[in-house]
Design a protein with these regions (language model features):
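Membrane-embedded beta-barrel scaffold of Gram-negative outer-membrane proteins
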Residues: 110, 116-122, 126-132, 153-230, ...
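Outer-membrane beta-barrel domain signature
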Residues: 1, 30-34, 92-94, 149-153, ...
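Outer-membrane beta-barrel translocator domains and adjoining extracellular loop/strand segments
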Residues: 1, 17, 25-32, 68-77, ...
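Residues that define the transmembrane beta-barrel architecture of outer-membrane proteins
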Residues: 37-41, 97-101, 156-160, 169, ...
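Short beta-alpha junctions and helix-cap segments that line functional grooves
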Residues: 103-105, 161, 274
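Face-selective signature of the C-terminal outer-membrane beta-barrel domain
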Residues: 1-122, 174-177, 242-250, 257-259
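Gram-negative outer-membrane beta-barrel transporters
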Residues: 178-182, 198, 215-294
């Protein structure tokens, strides 16, 4: 990659060009995905300008992405499963060639000598990763039989945030609040969670579902999934909101300085139908104590 600085006296401007050619290959017993290749060409532009009482930051990025890979379909033969366990199913080859565009703008200003505020908006497109597209096999590290989808669309997220910064030398505080709407959010959904959602709408058929569940478990064993949870990469609109806060103070102590701080971050995420997005980090409290000797 290369970065070109085209700044002038009134603004900071940079152009970034980057090219990545990446091979993804998983070998051994845990070969849950066939070899895949990704080629990505990126060009980005960044501008930072002082508008008097406001500071403006703008960024734009264009990605041209090509992903190629294959998916081996499972072959099931109940009568001769042990006899032909090493045989491979039909292989389907895919080539995804697409582009994405992302844009971000932040406008900030000082309210007082110690307090600043900034408002930001970002629209980001993301093409599915090779794993999300071509995964198809047992992933022992997660205890799941994970299945990708070569027909996934790109994600598009729109984010609004507001940030406050305070610093008077000895004491500082930071708080940021955001809300993000994501179209076609890609998530790894456990099949049993999908069944649970259906059960909520068919409570009168609980016994029937239990019998089917046992039957499906037997089928999974026959298909070589063992006790692994079957999970699929799927898409659904989602909404994220949350905040990050941090504050701290420094003290002169002996021949050095003692810095104390506390931080907390919270993320809430729901799909459009009201169900929670899986695998979201729980709220965190972060405590820090650092002593620096002069």
């Amino acid at each position: 990659g290369a970065t070109f600085d085209i700044s002038n006296d009134s603004s900071t401007q940079k152009v970034v060009v980057n090219f990545v050619d990446e091979d993804n290959s998983i070998v051994g017993e845990e070969a849950f995905m066939n070899p895949a290749n990704s080629k990505e060409f990126t060009i980005g532009y960044y501008l930072s300008k002082d508008l008097g009482i406001y500071d403006l930051d703008v960024g734009f990025r264009h990605d041209q992405i090509e992903r190629s890979g294959s998916v081996t379909e499972e072959e099931h033969d109940d009568d001769h499963g042990d006899e032909h366990g090493d045989e491979h199913g039909e292989v389907d080859y895919y080539n995804i060639d697409d582009s994405t565009n992302s844009f971000a703008v932040t406008l900030g200003r000082s309210l007082t000598d110690n307090l600043g505020i900034s408002l930001g908006y970002a629209s980001v497109e993301r093409l599915p990763s090779s794993i999300e597209l071509f995964m198809n096999g047992p992933h022992m590290a997660t205890g799941r039989f994970e299945v990708g989808d070569p027909n996934l669309n790109s994600e598009t997220s729109n984010n609004f945030d507001i940030t406050f910064n305070f610093d008077n030398g000895d004491f500082y505080a930071y708080a940021s609040f955001y809300i993000t709407d994501v179209d076609n959010y890609i998530a790894l959904i456990d099949e049993e969670d999908d069944h649970m959602d259906e059960d909520e709408h068919h409570e009168d058929e609980d016994d029937h579902h239990e019998e089917e569940g046992e039957h499906h478990e037997d089928e999974h064993d026959d298909h070589g999934h063992g006790n692994l949870i079957h999970a699929n990469y799927m898409q659904e609109d989602a909404e994220f909101d949350g905040y990050e806060i941090e504050f701290g103070r420094s003290f002169d102590l002996g021949s050095g300085e003692l810095a104390l701080s506390f931080g907390r971050d919270v993320v809430n995420a729901e799909f459009a139908d009201g169900h929670y997005v899986p695998r979201i980090n729980p709220a965190r409290n972060i405590y820090s104590l650092v002593y620096t000797q002069d």
